[in-house]
A protein has these predicted regions:
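Short, contiguous acidic and Ser/Thr-rich linear segments
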Residues: 22-36
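Well-ordered beta-strand positions in beta-sheet-rich domains
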Residues: 24-28, 77, 94, 161
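Active-site phosphate-binding and catalytic loops of NTP-dependent enzymes
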Residues: 49-55
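Short polar catalytic/cofactor-binding loops
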Residues: 9-15
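Short strand-turn-strand beta-turns centered on an Asx-Gly dipeptide
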Residues: 10, 69-73
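Short structural boundary motif marking the start of a folded domain
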Residues: 2-7
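Ferredoxin-type iron-sulfur electron-transfer modules in oxidoreductases and energy-metabolism complexes
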Residues: 35-47, 97-309
Length: 309
């Protein structure tokens, strides 16, 4: 490991109109064996810039507080080892540390993530059995355990291009929100219906399955495959499955709502786009029917066991 390194850190805060204002400042820091990025930031605070704002708490990858962009990638600073950063940084180039770009700036490396918690208030709470003891087996809980491991670091939100690049904060609730919602919607004893809100209010159709949120999740949650796609399939089952309600399906399709789910395929002048869109919808419908059957079977088994025990 190098004896010293140059960190180029964003320093600034919003102006009176709330517009971020600041600059990148270089700090040369001595390194010790085994340091992580957060250690270096703390050393900069101790030796160069005591007013450098940085949010952190556990330094163990459990609280999600120290999220930032290191060399352009969303990461937890406490879990990002300096030897890995040095290996990816070109020789004689500084290491870049910036705040998350998808959230309003508070100061330096600290951002305001209150938007995400305001979104949470729109989720309907769980609606389970009236009996005081909720009984279901571990195999049914395994699906939820993954979602409960979220540390709310907001890295998935920061890397989501719908929010980061297109600023669709009113239309799209974001990947972290759907993880939280999935933990309730997929509970084996939950009877609440959130499908209309998922479709209309939370904008799940804006996600086009790039899986960038999954790639940056430090908890290893399969956000796209295990949360977002199953929720999309439930929407398709509810609104577009002719096996469930042919009349409603025909009405939804003829009203043009299908474009909500096939937006990427319907753009442009390629004559094959319509065929692609139809093929995509058929695949969605097939997966939705299979998911509906599996969910119904799991729910019915859980309820039978609950009543018998």
């Amino acid at each position: 490991m190098a004896d010293s390194v140059t960190f180029r850190i964003f320093r600034g805060e919003p102006d009176k109109d709330g517009v971020p204002f600041g600059k990148m400042v270089d700090y040369k820091v001595d390194l010790d064996e085994g340091m992580v990025v957060l250690d270096v930031v703390h050393r900069i605070q101790a030796e160069h810039a005591p007013d450098l704002a940085c949010r952190w708490n556990c330094k163990a990858g459990k609280c999600g507080s120290c999220s930032a962009e290191v060399n352009g990638k969303p990461r937890l600073m406490c879990m990002t080892r300096m030897e890995d950063i040095l290996a990816e940084t070109p020789e004689n180039e500084p290491i870049l540390v910036k705040p998350m770009q998808a959230f309003p700036l508070t100061k330096d490396l600290v951002t305001d993530t209150s938007w995400a918690y305001q979104k949470d208030q729109k989720i309907k709470p769980i609606n389970g059995p009236e009996e005081p003891d909720w009984v279901f087996h571990q195999e049914e809980a395994d699906r939820l355990q993954e979602f409960r491991s979220c540390i709310e670091c907001m890295l998935c939100v920061n890397t989501c291009h719908v929010l980061r690049e297109h600023q669709m904060y009113d239309e799209f609730a974001g990947p972290r929100f759907f993880v939280r919602l999935a933990s309730l919607e997929m509970h084996p004893l939950d009877n609440e219906s959130r499908i209309p809100e998922i479709k209309d209010d939370f904008g799940i159709g804006y996600c086009n399955i790039t899986r960038c949120c999954t790639e940056v999740c430090p908890a290893g949650i399969q956000i796209t495959d295990n949360a977002i796609i199953p929720l999309k399939e439930r929407v398709v089952t509810e609104y577009y499955d002719p096996l469930i309600d042919p009349i409603k399906t025909a009405k939804n399709l003829t009203s043009g709502v299908l474009s909500y789910f096939t937006e990427d395929f319907s753009k442009g002048s390629d004559p094959g786009n319509k065929k692609k869109a139809k093929s995509t919808f058929e695949e969605e419908r097939s997966r939705a029917e299979e998911a509906r059957k599996m969910d119904s079977e799991r729910t019915e088994k859980a309820r039978k066991r609950f009543r018998s025990e």
